[in-house]
Structures are given as C-alpha cells and as structure tokens.
Amino acid sequence: SANPPFLKPKSWRLDRIGPDSSVSVKDRDVELDGGFLLTLADSVRGNATVTVEHDGHVVAEETKPVELLAYNEWGGTGFMPELLAAFSMPNDPAIDRLLHDASLILRAAGKPDGIDGYHSKSRQRVWEIASAIYAAVCNLGISYAVPPTSFERDGQKIRLPGQILENRVSTCLDTTMLFSAALEQAGLNPVVALPRGHAVAGVWLQPEELSTIVIDDAETLRKRIQLEELILIETTFVTSHPAPPFSKAVATATESITPERDDTFHAAVDIRRARSHRIFPLCRKSETPSAKDETPSIPVAELP
C-alpha cells in the first residue's frame, strides 16, 4: 500500500513460509497510479508499506519513505538523468505552431519550406532547419528566468512547451527542452548537454546518436563537433532582444564544453537513444495561444 495512493494496491498469496526461511517473490510488478501522479503540482513526501498477514493478523510490516515529484519536475543528474528525455515533448500542440513558423521563415529566406528531417541527406539542410527553428523561437519574445541553484544536479520543474508559448518566460533548461521537442518533431535527433549551472540543446547533422543514453564526458561531444556531425545551440539567446545570429548561438554553446571546463561538466542525454530504451515523452497536452493572439513571425534566421 502507499500513502498518498501513488501505487495501486498489490497483494501476493504465499502458501507457506517455513521457520527461519525466506521466500523470494518473483512477481514484483507494482503498478504506479499515473492518474494520481499527474495531479501533483508540487513534490510531496509519502511512503510505501509492505504488510505480512496470517489469518487476518499482521505479523510483520515495513514502511519506506518515498519522494514524489511534481508531474513536470525532473530529478536532476544525481538520479536517473536519462529521464530528462521525457520532457522533450514533440507532440505538444505548441510544437506544431513553432514548426509552422519555421517553415514560413525558410520560405521567406528562399529555401525549401519542408520540415523534412534527414530526408535530404544534407548537413547543410539540417543546419537550415535548426536555424529556422531558432528564429521561430526568437520571434516569441520570451523573457529569461533564473533557474534554481544546482538545477543540473538536483533537478527543477520544467515549463512545458505550451506554458512557454502562453507565458513567454523560461529558464535555460526550459528553452533547451523546447528546442529538443521541436528538433525531434522535425525528424532530427536532439541532444541535451548539461555544463555546470546551464543547459544547451544539440542536434546531430546526420542521423546518428550516442552509444549510450547518458554520457558524462564532454570530450565525446567535442570530437563529434570537430567532425561536423553535431552542433550545440545556446538556447538562452532567444531571450535576448534582438537575438544574436544562429551561428553565434552555436559558437557560444560550443565554448561551454571546452576542455578547461571538463571538471564541471555533468552529463549529456541523447533523446533518440532514450526513445529506443522506451523513455517516452510525458503524456500531457497543453493549450497554445489562439490564432487571434499570435503575432506574425518576422524572419530573423541566418540561412546561408
């Protein structure tokens, strides 16, 4: 049993436990109550209890404390950092709006307006799509919010795409996950890198992925960047008005993982690799601003 009821009740029937002996329970499939967890707006402390009964009498009981995070809260790199991939939400309705704006920006720049992922087999085309997404986010007029101290280690609540588009405020991790979702929905493979006190987005320029979901060395990223297989993007630049060009966002993000900063690099999470390990996006829809509230996008992309 659990209090609050974040677990669905589960019972096992054991025919016999001999004196001074033990029995291993093989069926340990305890089901979480997703509906309850989805209602948590803030983290709460709870407990899970295992009770042993015989003939209706309790003969043993053990209770363990559990911390329940809010539905939109990531626990940090200290525990299962790969779960950050769940906050890349490509199917959030807000992402389609961003990709629509990115398509218009491509068209205005005289480029093909299809958001076609790796279909063209061109690294230059991936750069163009990523640059157009950057421009579309710049046009939102987002304001910067200071993240919690040591968020990359201890975690934080993450604003979902619809919340960002509605309220126009975000931390570096919020905008990074927004970019990740847009890149993923565009058919590209995103990466999230976590230097100390910061978060930046990345995208593979060809259909690649890291060998594991999470890496803790920046050298792997640097090698792929040098091979022109991967770029990183400083997503907080979208909160500057006017925003720096896309090439500057790429250069600045790359500087955040220089060898001199290796001792402060926390992790990088490969979103596509996480999906192949069944870490899927959060199942939560958000409202996007209605069309009458939207302002026309102004192409500010840097598209060679």
Which residues does each predicted region cover?
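A structural boundary/capping signal
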Residues: 1-304
